[in-house]
Amino acid sequence: MGSDRKIRVVVGGVFDIIHAGHVHFLKMAKELGDELIVIVAHDETVKKRKGRPPINPAEDRAEVLKAIRYVDDVVIGKPGEISLDLIKRLKPDVIALGPDQDFDCEDLKRKLKSIGLNVEVIRLPYLYKKDRAKTSKIIERITEIFCD
């Protein structure tokens, strides 16, 4: 008999103001396996990486993500860079990176291998209109429309 184990896909990100680009990304990631787990960046991590706090706190971002049909579970990450301990606990078969995430796939694979994980790391392409599928662009448009 074959294994009944589901293929687990893990993605991570800020997911601050959810837009169609996020939904397309999550849909494509879900198509890589049976189960999709999202790691939401901790508020401190967002502030450090982007130079500003997120618009929405991690708990709210997680709640919105849980409502998206492609997402099976959501975990809030720890402050700082990617937690290899958290990834080890989640036991992914695949990690899907977004097109704008600045991780090197091969470097990430090496780090995962060093802790005993043989995980496929895949970079997904932009699936939606690049100029409309970025939170920073949405914030710019909001300030242009409402702050003039």
From Swiss-Prot:
Single Gene Ontology BP term?
FAD biosynthetic process
What InterPro entries does UniProt report for this protein, alphabetically? Archaeal_FAD_synthase (IPR050385), Cyt_trans-like (IPR004821), FAD_synth_RibL (IPR024902), Rossmann-like_a/b/a_fold (IPR014729)
Q: Name one GO molecular function term.
A: FMN adenylyltransferase activity
Protein's pathway: Cofactor biosynthesis; FAD biosynthesis; FAD from FMN: step 1/1
**The reaction(s) this protein catalyses:** FMN + ATP + H(+) = FAD + diphosphate
Tell me the SUPFAM superfamilies matching this sequence: Nucleotidylyl transferase
Keyword Nucleotide-binding (UniProt):
yes
- Role according to the record: Catalyzes the transfer of the AMP portion of ATP to flavin mononucleotide (FMN) to produce flavin adenine dinucleotide (FAD) coenzyme.
Which PANTHER family has this protein been placed in?
A: FAD SYNTHASE
Query: What interactions and quaternary structure are annotated?
Result: Homodimer.
Q: Return the HAMAP family for the record.
A: FAD_synth_arch
| Protein family according to the UniProt entry | Belongs to the archaeal FAD synthase family.
What is the name attached to this protein's record? FAD synthase
Q: Which organism is it from?
A: Pyrococcus horikoshii (strain ATCC 700860 / DSM 12428 / JCM 9974 / NBRC 100139 / OT-3)
